[in-house]
Amino acid sequence: MLIKMVEKQILKLSKLCEHWAAHNNSHKESYVKWRDVAREVLNLPTVVEKLNKAIEMMDKSTEYLLSAKKELDL
């Protein structure tokens, strides 16, 4: 019984990691869109730099989430 409960929690956490990674990607698309607006329309180079950093961090977060999922799926 306890083993089944642990397996169920591992499966849930794996699915959450996958969901969070996908959610990050949808946010990233929006960040990229608005970074481009900040660059091309609004001419806000410091905002562009900060959005680029946020995009990099989002990519890193997604990488960690997918790595955790892979470990859970072993």
Describe each PLM feature range:
Residues L2-R35:
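N-terminal acidic leader/helix
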Residues K33-L74:
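Short, charge-rich amphipathic interface segments used for partner binding and complex assembly
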